[in-house]
């Protein structure tokens, strides 16, 4: 199985992408930095670092808050517990053994532990209080998506198309469920969502799948995209976005597919709209926010699927998944800027340069601010001064 990156090389303003099987070269041009009259300037409360961060590698490692502690990690295996008030270190541990740890999926905080996946095909459980390794298990495939916790289980989606449930305290495998993986897929996997005794996740073959959490029995699969075109690249239909639940409706989006709303009880589609994306979506309860494959930011009415607004001024700036901060929608880009938009209109309200290494993930919310992590490992707590 070959895996390809879904966006242009980091830091390049103009990138030629060669589709080998088609022998055609398409030029992707990054939009210039929008001119924004910022209504506020976020201020830094403290700053620290977490090793070398994730570098230029594909990674969705995100900080997580639990038990009044902020946990951060780097790709090479460094994990730290920080005081969110001042950034001071409580403990740190290095998970690198004979080879680089290549942490990539996480961090998840549950059952008084931390759970992190790796490109080496491991899931690692750490004690939240000490950083001690509780267990370390191989799962037979890269873990690029964040593990989730439900019903005493840690559920991971691997790059080989296998959803695996592990005992939260021992790491023992409880069940595994495999789905078909095409020869060519995007680099990335869907973080599952668990609710009401079910687990829902996107697959590499263009489907949203549902299973019973306790025993891993497949309930249904709903197409999100159908392979089309003459080349393998044209036929990519990965559903790498994490499903979100709003009331009795499940939402997800696929690459070369659709944004789809599905009734949780019947598994029937409520509406479908033609948006292509491999990035997580967000909701504020009434709207669904999508980053398209061209890095257009779109707001859609959750009930009807009607497009409310579209902001195309960040085209191909390799945006993070959208995050809701206060009354704003925030995305980071590959050149190290945070862009703040009005949720109702999509208009820019602020812009902030942080670090030219860029962002792999968006901000993590705290009770009194938010934390950002850059690709080179900078960790900063920011607050909004309006």
What residue ranges belong to the model's regions?
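C-terminal motif of bacterial Sec signal peptides marking the signal peptidase cleavage site
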Residues: 18-20
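Extracytoplasmic beta-rich repeat domains
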Residues: 25-31, 36-64, 92-108, 134-150, ...
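Structural signature of WD-repeat beta-propellers
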Residues: 74, 118, 158-159, 203-204, ...
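Short loop/turn segments that connect beta-strands within beta-propeller blades
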Residues: 83-86, 127-130, 167-171, 213-216, ...
């Amino acid at each position: 199985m070959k895996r390809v990156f879904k966006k242009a090389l980091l830091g390049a303003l103009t990138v030629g992408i060669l589709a080998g099987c088609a022998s055609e070269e398409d030029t992707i041009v990054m939009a210039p930095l929008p001119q924004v009259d910022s209504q506020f300037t976020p201020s830094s409360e403290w700053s620290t670092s977490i090793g070398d961060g994730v570098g230029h590698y594909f990674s969705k490692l995100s900080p997580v808050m639990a038990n009044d502690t902020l946990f951060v990690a780097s790709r090479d295996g460094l994990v730290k517990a920080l005081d969110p008030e001042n950034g001071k270190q409580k403990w740190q541990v290095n998970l690198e053994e004979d080879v680089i740890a290549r942490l990539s999926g996480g961090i998840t905080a549950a059952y008084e532990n931390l759970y992190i996946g790796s490109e080496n095909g491991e899931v690692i459980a750490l004690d939240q209080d000490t950083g001690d390794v509780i267990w370390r298990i191989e799962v037979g495939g890269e873990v690029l998506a964040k593990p989730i916790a439900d019903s005493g289980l840690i559920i991971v989606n691997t790059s080989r198309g296998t959803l695996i449930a592990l005992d939260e305290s021992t790491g023992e495998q409880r069940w595994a469920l495999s789905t078909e993986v095409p020869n060519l897929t995007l680099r990335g996997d869907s973080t599952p969502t668990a609710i009401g005794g079910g687990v829902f996740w996107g697959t590499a073959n263009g489907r949203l799948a549902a299973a019973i959490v306790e025993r891993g029995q497949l309930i249904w699969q709903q197409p999100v995209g159908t392979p089309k075109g003459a080349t393998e690249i044209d036929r990519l239909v990965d559903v790498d976005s994490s499903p979100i639940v709003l009331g009795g409706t499940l939402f997800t989006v696929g690459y070369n597919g659709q944004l789809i709303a599905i009734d949780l009880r019947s598994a029937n589609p409520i509406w479908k709209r033609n948006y292509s994306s491999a990035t997580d979506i967000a909701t504020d309860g009434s709207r669904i926010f999508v980053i398209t494959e061209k890095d257009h930011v779109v707001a859609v009415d959750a009930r009807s699927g009607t497009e409310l607004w579209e902001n195309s001024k960040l085209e191909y700036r390799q945006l993070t998944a959208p995050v809701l901060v206060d009354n704003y929608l925030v995305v980071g880009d590959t050149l190290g800027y945070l862009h703040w938009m009005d949720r109702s209109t999509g208009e820019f309200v602020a812009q902030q340069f942080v670090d030219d290494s860029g962002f792999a993930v968006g901000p993590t919310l705290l009770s009194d601010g938010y934390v950002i992590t850059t690709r080179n490992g900078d960790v900063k707590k920011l607050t909004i001064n309006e």
